[in-house]
């Protein structure tokens, strides 16, 4: 039998702490929010967004922002990305579009102002949360 030339079980060793369970995660976040009352949770493909959002409400923030609410309308995004799309589901074209281009700049500006003005905990979740 031929030996595979790739690692079937890849892993990366990291140092640090792993927290398991939403109660423990939220407790740790509460401690960190005492020092700096703003939390940005950026999402990546495959994250169970609704679960994370629901659980982060445990933190009882004064302001909770979901970045999906700051995006341009879907029709604008489709128009913006159309020239990079092909009929092939795997291949398209390299784009010069940035993450910032997907956001409605007026909504983004207003959200930033709300974050600055808010007294108390702020939680921003979603793709581009740290923007």
Predicted features and spans:
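Conserved beta-strand segments of the P-loop GTPase G domain that flank and frequently precede/overlap
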Residues: 40-42, 65, 124-125
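Short, polar loop motifs at secondary-structure junctions
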Residues: 126-130
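Glycine-rich P-loop/Walker A and Walker A-like loops and their local beta1-loop-alpha1 context
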Residues: 14-58
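ATP-dependent small-molecule kinase phosphotransfer cores
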Residues: 2-24, 51, 60-121
